[in-house]
Amino acid sequence: MKELIVISGKGGTGKTSLMAAFASLAENKALCDADVDAADLHLIMNPKVVRRSDFQSGNTAAINNDLCTECGLCREMCRWDAISAAYEVNSIDCEGCGVCVYFCPEKAINFPINTCGEWFISDTRFGPMVHAHLGIAEENSGKLVALVRKEARKLAEQKGLDLILTDGPPGVGCPVIASLSGVDAVLIVTEPTVSGKHDMQRVVDLADHFKVPAWVCVNKFDLNRAMALEIEAFAGEKGLGVLDHIPFDPVFTKSMVQGQTIFEFDGKGPLGSTITRIWRTLSERMGIY
């Protein structure tokens, strides 16, 4: 079984739209949305939830007022100022360090585990999909990414599937690190802007750190051809191949608004031909088909 992850380094490069297009081309695969902080693959996939589970991680202090003597030690020890003068814990400010629980002489502080979000196993018109939703201001998205990927692999094994297509999170932080470990290949989708090039460079270094084969695809290349050439030159210096250049096309946005892949909306145009060519090249290099 192979896993391909599509990442970008920054948001807005067209990563998810390209990933959805691959989903309509690939066969015998499971889908995984690892962008748990701001998941949007479901907007195109329109998944039908089969199983829903809570994601629990971290702890938040809660003061039992029946036991609390208001000695003030917890407020004194808390470095996050999460405990008010009325001895109530602000769940947003609380970092879950547990120092108040440890030092409370009356053992009046509970420390329950947090329910941070949900993860789902769903059916889509392109195959099974594992995705998640992280709650507002919740952390530990890296753990949720690892969980989603683990469940996607388990699901693919149960169904005898050969491929996992993963829509990765933007950036280079903890969620991206969690999404890169153990994958077979990375496709980096970038755009010809200063921030696009800069963030692509950072994510290229991250993929290199994990020793994961990576390729680059430049979306909307014709909006700034000079920058597209700079990106291609950088990729060459790093020994990476630029699979192709995708021209700017409003079809991407129009299909997304309709909740469709570009092949469902208008697959006969030049954009569809380019993406099909990219997918064939990826398939050959990964030895998928």
Region spans (language model):
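Walker A (P-loop) phosphate-binding motif
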Residues: 1-26
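Short beta-strand-centered segment that lines the nucleotide-binding/catalytic pocket of NTP-utilizing
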Residues: 29-42, 113-118
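Switch II (G3) loop of P-loop NTPases
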Residues: 35, 134-136, 140, 149-176
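Conserved nucleotide-binding/hydrolysis micro-motifs of P-loop NTPases
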Residues: 36-38, 171, 193-195, 221-225, ...
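P-loop NTPase switch/communication element
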Residues: 39-57, 121-123
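Iron-sulfur cluster-binding cysteine motifs and their immediate structural context
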Residues: 73-90, 99-115
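Inter-motif core of Ras-like GTPase G domains
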Residues: 173-194
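C-terminal lobe/tail of nucleotide-utilizing enzymes
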Residues: 206-289
